[in-house]
């Protein structure tokens, strides 16, 4: 076999692998997996022992094509009977209108301590032209905030709330998108979210981009006990089999999924 023929076949195989992986990721977007992680903290108040959190992220509703399958995913979340549900951004790909068909699905999410959310880089509408159908970029963002509220989700915008259980209190912080990568928006304000939270013995942070943790949270806010992020799903492109896990996003982000 000649060198040129070999390289042609090699290129074809590589392209086929890439396309196959993308197709697999797209076709399996409703193949939900629940990953269970147990954490232990000495400073978590006794009243919160056994606290169960369901963490979801990167819904990207504009990519959905099967409402019934989406509803099944919500059912799986509800079946977990969590104390608290946290969503860490990217509700849409670009526009709030993507959520119109799915609001009556996601508004079913509920938990005793509430459903809280933050914004991700896609939620700001930075990747499409505006105005669109007479709607400006600013109006789109405001309508997206309203969608969170209408679904019963408390959107945290550089602020914190206090969670109370059995007379004990912990702080839940949520910030807007903050990335250590220059190409992504940096609207998050940890100083605002953390202000007044010092007195609580345990703090959970919701921040869409995990690069925020190494760059700012770990060095400047060491009293944050748990940070939950999304973002690094790499367009669902990757391979995960027993004993092996790979995605191109791992070469960009230290923390990835």
Protein language model regions, located:
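Short N-terminal helix-initiation segments at or just after the protein's N-terminus
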Residues: 2, 27-30, 204-209
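N-terminal secretory signal peptides and thylakoid transit peptides that target proteins
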Residues: 2-14
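Soluble catalytic domains of enzymes that build or remodel membrane lipids, polysaccharides, and related
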Residues: 44-257
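Single-pass alpha-helical transmembrane signal-anchor segments
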Residues: 12-26
């Amino acid at each position: 076999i000649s060198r040129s023929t070999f390289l042609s076949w090699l290129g074809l195989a590589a392209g086929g692998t890439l396309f196959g992986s993308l197709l697999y990721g797209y076709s399996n977007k409703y193949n939900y997996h629940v990953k269970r992680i147990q954490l232990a903290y000495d400073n978590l108040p006794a009243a919160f022992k056994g606290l169960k959190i369901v963490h979801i992220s990167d819904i990207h509703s504009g990519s959905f094509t099967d409402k019934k399958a989406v509803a099944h995913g919500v059912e799986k979340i509800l079946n977990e009977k969590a104390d608290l549900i946290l969503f860490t951004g990217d509700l849409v790909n670009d526009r709030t209108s993507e959520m119109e068909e799915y609001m009556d699905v996601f508004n079913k999410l509920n938990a005793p301590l509430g459903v809280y959310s933050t914004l991700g880089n896609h939620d700001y509408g930075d990747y499409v032209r505006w105005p669109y159908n007479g709607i400006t970029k600013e109006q789109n963002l405001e309508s997206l905030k309203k969608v969170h509220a209408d679904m019963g989700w408390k959107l945290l915008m550089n602020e914190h709330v206090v969670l109370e259980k059995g007379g004990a209190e912990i702080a839940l912080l949520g910030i807007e998108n903050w990335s250590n990568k220059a190409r992504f928006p940096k609207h998050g304000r940890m100083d605002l979210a953390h202000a007044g939270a010092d007195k609580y013995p345990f703090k959970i942070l919701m921040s869409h981009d995990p690069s925020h943790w190494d760059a700012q949270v770990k060095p400047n806010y060491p009293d944050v006990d748990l940070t939950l992020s999304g973002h690094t799903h790499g367009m669902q492109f990757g391979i995960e089999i027993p004993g092996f896990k790979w995605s191109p996003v791992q070469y960009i982000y230290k923390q990835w999924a």
